[in-house]
Amino acid sequence: MTRTATIVLLLAIATSAAPARAQTPAPLTVGSVTASAGEKVSGYIEVPAGVDSATRIPVTVVRGARAGPTLALIAGTHGYETQPIIALQRVRRALDPAALAGTVVLVHIANPPSYFGRTIYYSPVDGKNLNRVYPGRADGTVSERIAFAITREVIEKADYIVDLHAGDGNESLRPYAYWTPLGGDARVDSLQREMILAFGHDLIVVDTTRPKDLASSVYTTNTALLLGKPAITTENGYLGESAEPMIRRNVDGVFRLMRWLRMVPGAVPMPRRVTWLHRFEVLRSPETGTWHPLVERAQLVREGALLGYLTDVFGDGRTDIRASFAGEVLYVVATPPMSRGEPLAMIGAPR
């Protein structure tokens, strides 16, 4: 062997024996925010004016120093569901990009018009429910444009998505989550299920009725699922209050999920006993008037149990509302104003 060939061979051996360098994540841009590896950057997704006013969605991108999945956390889809919003502020402060594998995209308030307008369910600008207009429209009303922006800037750029909900300003709600398998991708359905357990939920509504057409996906997480991305909807909080146990529950759930995804170190103990609710019903008001609830969240009720009653604005004309099957009260509207067709309570049962 010639001296030159020997040198080439030794260099090849040395190169193959050297440890591979960890891949540095490329910068990620969400709206006006660009974060490079090891950075935490906050800013906005601008939603331009259209048929109505403009708005801007506050976001933070935490780009880990090491490669890993991209997890999107969305709070404030309904503006008065406040506990997840406060929780993501705490998550933002706690996240250290130097210790993170992957990226966390935090959508702090998905629905600023509703949050600052202090409205339940609907935007004060266009009267629409943001979680009923996905995947949105670039030329639609403000709620539709918000949904379009979140679909393009957040959902399409993420690997995993969590839509963090709570009881709205009028809803007294006990913690639960939704598992919504679409049946088209067993991998996604299974990962969605595991994400819920990793988050820490032990009471899970099983809903197999979600739309299967991406053009009319309706819901935030359903949009992600139809794009082949595991996504879950969690419910932790009630009545728009700054309830510390519910804020902590949201924060803890996020970090449990991040450990499960191996974005941060640590073990994830799964819930020991899980109840899957295959039967559920949202009872809706047959009339506009005043609601008098007689049950509380997490209360067990029998079939035919009196959940509350409606009267007119003078207190006359009582209409009783009863449970159509035995189960648990997942939430009950705890405030008097009631419009025809709006939710009164939700009941769930295993079968």
What are these regions (language model features)?
Residues A5-S16:
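Bacterial N-terminal signal peptides
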